[in-house]
Amino acid sequence: MLHLLALALLLSLVSAAPAPGQALQRSGIIGGKEAPGSRWPWQVSLRVRDQYWRHQCGGSLIHPQWVLTAAHCIGPELQEPSDFRVQLREQHLYYQDRLLPISRVIPHPHYYMVENGADIALLQLEEPVSISRHVQPVTLPPASETFPPESQCWVTGWGDVDNGRPLPPPYPLKQVKVPIVENSVCDWKYHSGLSTDYSVPIVQEDNLCAGDGGRDSCQGDSGGPLVCKVNGTWLQAGVVSWGDGCAKPNRPGIYTRITSYLDWIHQYVPQEP
């Protein structure tokens, strides 16, 4: 989207935007429940160096040596591989951590703010992981997959359980089922109550919307996977990106649409493990 349109959108969102403590980026699961062990074997906790290796975002294993996440999770102040670790096979945060080092951090070159799209990044692990029942890559969709409206999909993460209410100990992985919302409907919903002209799109072509009032991702879930079962196979439809608050009426969660970036992903990630 052109800088001018982005500026117009940001100006119109001032009154509706979250307070400083409620960034547009997503961080937690609302309206969901604790995920059964090993149900989502591709789920990743992305950690950043702090007083300890703190959970920053979610992510997904898409190859034994590659993790997919959101670009806003790794920048702009964090760019070096040594700034990050990855945790797989984790049901509860910080319990029996076995953190894996990263060798490459690759944000999409067109990313500069979540509202403008391209909110996607790749992390290469120093070594491939061993695949097991508990650790498996998620399947990426074919370019032709559209994920039609009302498809029931799942989003997972360790984010907030309500607006401004962090996930309490023992920090279990949460899951929630969310319906896909057609992009034009999602865009109309986001314009509702704003002064932004309807000719200025809020939802981008490379976005995918999902969720309704009471069921959504939230702060801390950013970068995590939105998965949909198609013909018996779990496909990653989106990467948790942004939204206005969490689980608000007329404010579905906004995801990066994986099919928009398959060519870019496969510049780096082998299509066969």
From Swiss-Prot:
Group of enzyme by EC: hydrolase
Disulfide bond residue pairs: 57-73, 153-228, 186-209, 218-246
Swiss-Prot/TrEMBL catalytic activity: Preferential cleavage: Arg-|-Xaa, Lys-|-Xaa, but with more restricted specificity than trypsin
Segments traversing the membrane: none
EC identifiers of the protein: 3.4.21.59
Source organism, top-level taxon: Eukaryota
Domain Peptidase S1: 29-270
Coiled coil: none
The protein's name in its UniProt record: Tryptase-2
UniProt source species: Ovis aries
